[in-house]
Structures are given as C-alpha cells and as structure tokens.
Amino acid sequence: MDTMKVNQKQKEYYLEQGYWGHETLLDRFLRTVERFPDREYVVDDRGNRHTYSQVDVLSSRIASYLKDMGIKPGDCVSFQVPVWSEFAVIAMGCLKAGAVMHPIAMCYEEPDLIHAMNKSDTKIYFGTAWFRGKDYEARLLAVMDRVAGLKHAVFLDSLGPVKGGFTTYREILETYDPLPREEYGLMDGLEVALILGTSGTTGSNKGVMLTHSNIIFSEEQFNLELGLDENDIMFMPAPLNHATGFHHGIIAPM
C-alpha cells in the first residue's frame, strides 16, 4: 500500500484545533461495548441481530484468525460482503488485528478486483461464496494468482457451498477463541484505518485512504448536526463499501 501522505503543517493544525487525535475507531467501539453491551448494533434483512457485545466476541474470533494468518498492523484485508451483519463483524475484527479495512463493491468483477487488491496490497480476502445467483468463489479463484500479496481467502457459505477448499467464516467462529485485548494490533488515530474505492467512472477505481481521525471527526460532526444520540436507530440501505454506507451505517452508530 502506498504511504499515506499528509501535509505535516496541516496535520499539526488539526491536532492543535482538536479535530484530529490519537484515538482509534477501535477505542470508540470498545467504549460503546462497555456502555451498551446488550443494545443491538446491527440487524440485517436475513433476520440476523447482534448486540455490541456479540459483535465484540465474534470480531475477536476473526481477529484471532487474522493474527494466526500473519496479519500485522498496517496490512490490508479486503472484504466483498453485502449489507449483512457479517460486514460489521469482519470490520471490527480487522481493527482488533490492526489491519487496514478495504471493503470492495459487490459489482467488482475480475479486472476491478485485480486492480483494487494489488493497489492496496491485500493479504486476505473475505467474501460470500454466492450472491444473487453469482459464483463469487469462482470469480476470486480466477484472479488469485494475479494478486501478488494475496495469501488467503475466506468465504461465507450462507447462500451456497464453498467448493474450493477455502476456510469458511463459520469455521473461524467455531474454531478460533476470541483474541485477548492485550494481543490487539496497536494503531494510532493518525494512521490509515480504511481504504474506500472511487466509482471509477473516468478510469480505474482509486483507493482513498482515510485515517481513524478522518472518520471519527466526520461522524462526530454528522451525529452532531443531525442531533443523533444513543436513542436513535440508523437505517442504512446503501452498500457498505460506499462512504455513505460505511461511515453512517457502521461507524456513526458506535
């Protein structure tokens, strides 16, 4: 992944003004888990419902897998997952391992997958084996040898079987213990947390690198301007790889 380029003078200004800080998205999530452990965090259209504490436990199992596969702070993990509860679990698992999150649009086919995962230097891919009658496992198999850094792939099998011998999301949750907090990957609020892809309307999609501080400040202001607090519920129909879906659907509620 290309080095994050932030104007040093501007960064110092953001810090002085209190816009940016060293707090991370994981810090925010864990604080919310402590405050509202039994409150629902995510509900999807398949009937899955998870509280903050449930996502905390499930994501810690994902983090254990990521660490076991050699993921280190700053490594990129890509996930091509619909608007499902698993998206939030995988995202929080990445944060606990210190990985950079890289959600990918469900519409990406071979050329876009190759480009996006090579540019981000993806180490591990999460996806659904099937979605809307399309074989996403076969699509990933067709590009794996053309993504230089990609070592492992994990598939959700809720809509169809995984045929290629890949690890499944279900297997991770059943076999890995939650990663202890003292083993979480250490990150800083000024470091890159997320890569979002542009639409690619004028050429190949580009990866927009966002720091923890970028996202925290953005969603603090979003909630403030709309008067949102812990008593509100966010309905998010937008794709979660989109800035609207990710920021307002995954981050704002925490």
What residue spans do the PLM features occupy?
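Conserved pre-ATP/AMP-binding loop-to-beta segment of ANL
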Residues: 37-38, 155, 160, 174-197, ...
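A short helix-loop-beta submotif of the ANL/AMP-binding
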Residues: 76, 82-102, 106-110, 118-125, ...
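Conserved AMP-binding
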Residues: 81-84, 105-107, 191, 228, ...
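Conserved AMP-binding/adenylate-forming core of the ANL superfamily
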Residues: 21, 38-92, 109-114, 165-174, ...
